[in-house]
Amino acid sequence: MLFRSIPEIPYDMDQVIKTIEHRMETGSRFTIVAVAEGAISKEDAALSKKEYKKKLAERTSPSIVYDIAKEIEAKTGRETRVAIPGHTQRGGQPDAQDRIFATQCGVEAALGCLRGEFGYMIALRDGKMCHMPLEDVAGKLKYVDPQSDLVREAKALGISFGDE
């Protein structure tokens, strides 16, 4: 059984608990609860935009899913685990076209670097590879601190930044 919560349909926590308890009573040993980004309870949906923003600002957990899990565990007495698949859920096994596109992006990026062109994202537009300024796609450039742990760790793994 899978319970899903999506922003378009505010959930009723009492109903979620009833569903889980019913499954436990009928012998089910687990219930999967899938919570989408932006999921909202009926109580929160009834708040004004200002009240809801204030509530979100006061939240101590990084996501509503942790609040839901905590409440399920408190009300059912059952262990509750959270798994956030993030971008991996959009993935899957790459096919030939994915590999070709990745190669095209890599080649175009490398050629741009050789020409001294930086601050661009490679994109496919109208069937052709093109350079898009990062300011246009990301709002602003985000710089990596060369002294950061991430850079140090990458170098320890043998990744070159062309500076040594």
Task: Give the positions of each predicted feature.
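Short glycine/threonine-rich loop-to-helix capping motif typified by GTGT followed
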Residues: A45-S48, G92-I100, M132-G139
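Short, ordered loop/turn segments at secondary-structure junctions
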Residues: E8-P10, E37-I40, P85-R90, R125-K128
